[in-house]
Amino acid sequence: MKRIHLVAAAVSVAISWSAFAAEGKHEHGHGHKPLHGGVVVDVKDVDYELVAAPTLIRLHLRDHGKAVDVSRTTAKLTLLAGNDRQDVDLKPSGGWLEAAGTFKVAPGTRVVAVVTTAGKPAATVRFVLK
């Protein structure tokens, strides 16, 4: 009988946690809205905003709502559009990471970014373009 109560309690906690997570509420006091017209993904309290155009890609980083110094940061993107795959290296440019060229960035394109900052472990960020 105790096992049934334990399982029921565990299921109840799991359902409560998923409902809380689905609401989009965050304890850290900032939202994840795009500031530059891109797609935002949060990984370990850092917001990564990918702004992708056919000739320019930018990646903006914010930590708890404040811009991150990207002077020692690089990123390697993999763009996946249907059967097409394209690798893109982003370098610091002003307060963001950037690459110029010709890119396939249609809605639905999946992007995997590996972001590396000196002295820190790399972060893997996944986007789906809108």
Q: PLM features: residue spans?
A:
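Intrinsically disordered, low-complexity terminal tails/loops enriched in metal-binding residues
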Residues: 2-5, 16-130
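Hydrophobic helical h-region of N-terminal Sec-dependent signal peptides
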Residues: 9-15
